[in-house]
Amino acid sequence: MKRIIQHLIIPVILLYAMTCNTSCTNGSKEKKERIAVVISTLNNPWFVVLGQSAVDKCKELGYDATLFDSQNNPSKEAEHFDNILASGYKAILFNPTDADGSGVNAKAAARAGVPVFCMDREINLPGACVTQILSDNYSGCITLGKYFVESMGKKGNYVEILGLVGDNNTWARSRGFHSVVDCYEGLKMVAQQNADFDQNKAMEVMESVMQAHPDIDAVFCGNDAMAMGAYQAILAAGKDGDIKVFGFDGANDCVNAIREGKIEATGMQFPKTMAITAATLADKYIKGERNLPKKLPVAVELVNKENVKNYGDFGRIDQ
């Protein structure tokens, strides 16, 4: 009888162990840690690349990742943060809508013990982010400004189209550009207006400015979407070739336009580099590392007709 009981118990134990092992394995798959990727807008190809590159790197590192679109709306961004903090995410890779306003959301995450890593756009509130991975916009626009001066022969009338007035990048780019261009008396800025980094708004701004100032020789735009919008307005006005267009970002359509001789130059940012760096640092933080840099600058490179063959897909071809 004792032997019969033993024969019955052993298979039961084995079956239990197998069941436990299977459920534990399935449980571990279901409970994969999550990282949130919050992007200011997905209505711009550059930011789509930034967001998707971050998601892809998180998945490569073994996390589930969710992409959130703030639609350039601070209220939408705040709503995303509320949902993220209530849902148990381990980290947030963040492209803010506003340098000042977005700090409140990042600070709330920090208080909740959820680390925030900023990509491309800066937050002014101290202690809100673990690390901010940012393009060196100021230096990049110094380089672009020098090429602008050279291309213009040190003289001419130009327009500046700014991005979002609440974004530090807008002013860093403008200051870098003017730190060079303002040294040349022959170069005169006849208008400066913002178009919120939006292609359609930039087209409308350029149409209006050309009517008020028919003698424009160039336009400097704070990003490539606006540069393409300005070019569309110039083309529609029959002034293609008469007004030089300069952008900033390194978006594919602008790089292709440089190849075709439609755009003079842009500043190549590297969204993939920033996204991969942010995801890698978040992974290190989750695993216990705390000795991480507060800021990481990413160099910007000038792209023009002389070197455009080396660039594509939001970066260098050899990357």
Functional labels for PLM-detected ranges:
Residues R34-L61, A65-N83, S87-Y89, N95-A99, ...:
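Extracytoplasmic "Venus flytrap"
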Residues M1-R34, K107-V114, Q319:
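Short, low-complexity disordered leader/linker segments with a strong preference
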Residues A99-S139, E150, N157, G163, ...:
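Flexible loop/hinge segments that line or gate small-molecule binding clefts
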Residues I161-N169, V180-V181, F270-Q319:
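Hinge/cleft segment of the Venus flytrap/periplasmic-binding protein
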Residues A36-V38, T66-F68, L93-N95, P115-D120, ...:
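Structural recognition of the beta-strand scaffold that forms the well-ordered cores
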Residues E77, I133-Y158, W171-A172, K201-M203, ...:
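Hydrophobic alpha-helical segments within soluble ligand-binding/sensing domains
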Residues W46-Y63, G140-L144, N168-L187, K201, ...:
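Short, solvent-exposed amphipathic alpha-helices that sit
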Residues F94-A110, F177, A191, A195-N256:
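Hydrophobic alpha-helical
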